[in-house]
């Protein structure tokens, strides 16, 4: 019905009548002439814009673009004279053709070139959508990630898709995920409600990794589930045994509303910046708090940085939020 009406307009209408203001401000009822040729050009222009935007969102931004998002901050809990550089890799979603092994290798090289003190990975290593030519198995992408190098090491947590895509773990309600086993097999520690203390030039800090907050969401198809997440914020922070500042890794950012001021910085991914972000706004954000934790730097009781991530989930489409590696500088220059 709609298509027939549009066709009738395009083929039969030779003019449109509308009221418009004269130079003296009056309203006239003279016909405002739009030729069929001009109208069809307008429609064709809209179609071309839509087609080019779609092509860019599918074929260019998610595959060919890669940027470094830099943050220089000084949380109240962080010593002003203690500089620490953290490189953040989030939401790879390994699959062909959108996140190939060659693409992951390029990300590894770009990350290493940042010369960060420590590298953290925030989960979602598996594809997370069906629009692929090949799912890249963990025993292929994990060895590539093993090429990441930093003086204080490379440290990882898991994301919801690392849990959701592991059907055995979902059915049994327990066990180590394929992603975790693959990362640990290549020497990358995976934190699940655990912490580790580090020092740089004699200055201490803690790295805390939270279990995923949505881990067993698909398991509800197989059996009743008492608790969806495997996260335990209180247990995790209870393992911090002194007053050195804490950096919390949490795949989903929503936990920030419960994170106490004891934590200096929370690093999260998951949202992909909405995957479509125009003029600082994302129409769809996988967060209970909408735009609040969609992307970038904000502050609750602690500072929170949400990465736009590197890959795609649901659909291999990005517009206005290019894939990114994040580099956070705490203290030092950030305090100036």
Question: What are these model-predicted stretches?
Answer:
Residues 85-181, 186:
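Membrane-embedded segments
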Residues 75-86, 188, 195-207, 299-304:
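Beta-strand-turn-beta hairpins that frame and shape the catalytic cleft
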Residues 26-50:
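N-terminal secretory signal peptides and thylakoid transit peptides that target proteins
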Residues 247, 252-330, 334:
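Conserved beta-sheet core of the metallophosphoesterase superfamily
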Residues 166-188, 200-246, 256, 318:
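Binuclear metal-dependent hydrolase catalytic cores centered on His/Asp/Glu-rich metal-binding motifs
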Residues 89-90, 119-124, 153-160, 191-193, ...:
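Active-site neighborhood of phospho(di)ester-bond hydrolases with catalytic His/Asp-centered motifs
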Residues 83-93, 204-214, 247-250, 303-309:
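Active-site-proximal beta-strand elements of phosphoester/diester hydrolases
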Residues 2-34:
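N-terminal secretory signal peptides
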């Amino acid at each position: 019905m709609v298509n027939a009406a549009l066709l009738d307009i395009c083929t039969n209408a030779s003019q449109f009548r509308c009221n418009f203001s004269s130079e003296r401000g009056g309203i006239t009822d003279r016909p405002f002439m739009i030729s069929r040729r001009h109208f069809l050009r307008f429609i064709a222009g809209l179609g071309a814009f839509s087609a080019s935007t779609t092509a860019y969102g599918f074929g260019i931004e998610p595959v060919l673009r890669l940027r470094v998002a830099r943050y220089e901050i000084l949380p109240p809990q962080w010593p002003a004279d203690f500089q620490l550089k953290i490189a953040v890799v989030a939401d790879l979603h390994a699959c062909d053709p959108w996140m190939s092994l060659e693409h992951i290798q390029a990300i590894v090289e770009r990350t290493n070139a940042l010369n960060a003190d420590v590298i953290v990975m925030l989960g979602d290593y598996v594809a997370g959508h069906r629009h692929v030519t090949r799912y890249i198995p963990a025993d292929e992408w994990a060895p590539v990630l093993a090429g990441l190098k930093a003086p204080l090491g490379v440290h990882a947590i898991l994301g919801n898709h690392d849990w959701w895509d592991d059907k055995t773990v979902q059915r049994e309600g327990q066990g180590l995920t394929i992603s975790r086993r693959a990362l640990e097999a290549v020497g990358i520690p995976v934190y699940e409600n655990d912490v580790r203390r580090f020092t740089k030039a004699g200055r201490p800090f803690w790295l805390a990794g939270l279990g995923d907050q949505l881990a067993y969401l698909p398991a509800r198809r197989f059996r009743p589930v008492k608790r969806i997440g495997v996260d335990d914020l209180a247990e995790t922070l209870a393992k911090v045994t002194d007053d050195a500042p804490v950096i919390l890794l949490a795949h989903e950012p929503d936990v920030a509303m419960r994170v106490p001021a004891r934590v200096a910085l929370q690093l999260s991914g998951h949202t992909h910046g909405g995957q479509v972000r125009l003029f600082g706004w994302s129409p769809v954000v996988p967060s209970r708090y909408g735009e609040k934790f969609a992307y970038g730097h904000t502050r609750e009781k602690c500072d929170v940085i949400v990465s736009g991530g590197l890959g795609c989930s649901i659909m291999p489409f990005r517009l206005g939020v290019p894939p990114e590696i994040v580099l956070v500088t705490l203290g030092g220059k950030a305090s100036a």
